[in-house]
Amino acid sequence: VKVLWLFFLVVAAIPCQSALAAAAGGGKEAALELRSVQADFVQVKHLKILARPLVSTGTFAFQVPQSLRWEYLEPVRSVLIMHNGAVRKFVERDGRLEEERGAQVGSLQIVLAEISNWLAGRFTDNEMFTVSFIDDRTIRFTPKEQQIAALISGIEIEIGGENGLLDSVLIEEGPDSYTRMTFSNRSINQQLPATLFTGP
């Protein structure tokens, strides 16, 4: 479930800084010209019980209207794909990616609905999170519902100065437990192959 909310928040932060500024100034909707986004990421997870943080690497891709791919490459490869309303998850076993049945479709449908709101520029029209703007580059999400708060106590996303693309995500999961993701090699509105969203 946590990776679904992380996935949502990454896509939520895609729109440009002009839309962010408009939302901070009064919640007005902004016209977005987003067609696609790709980036690499490094995820570092800190837990009190661990002597060293857990480090994972991967990539994500998004294409309008609702095609998304979230892929962990190391230490264990897994792929989450959402395309045309369908959700598929693959996990590597014995060197091959195998599809996992029974993915959490209910949660994923909620995520897709939230993504649509954000891509339409509705930054503050959010039923699940209280959204606050720390500065012109940082947005903080505080869960409204206890069900979500039990998993995530708070999230901060930081937008880069160039093109308004995502720089990092900080997920606060409890005392001495947090996850930070840093993004690189970001590209926007490039032509993406259809196969990215149809299979592993």
Could you describe each region identified by the protein language model?
Residues 22-47, 51-53, 86, 91-147:
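Flexible, processing/modification-adjacent segments and terminal tails
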Residues 51-59, 82, 156, 177:
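Amphipathic hydrophobic-ligand
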Residues 123-200:
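Gly/Pro-enriched, hydrophobic low-complexity segments
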Residues 5-15:
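Bacterial N-terminal signal peptides
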Residues 35-43, 56-60, 66-70:
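One face of beta-strands
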Residues 59-111, 179:
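An acidic-aromatic
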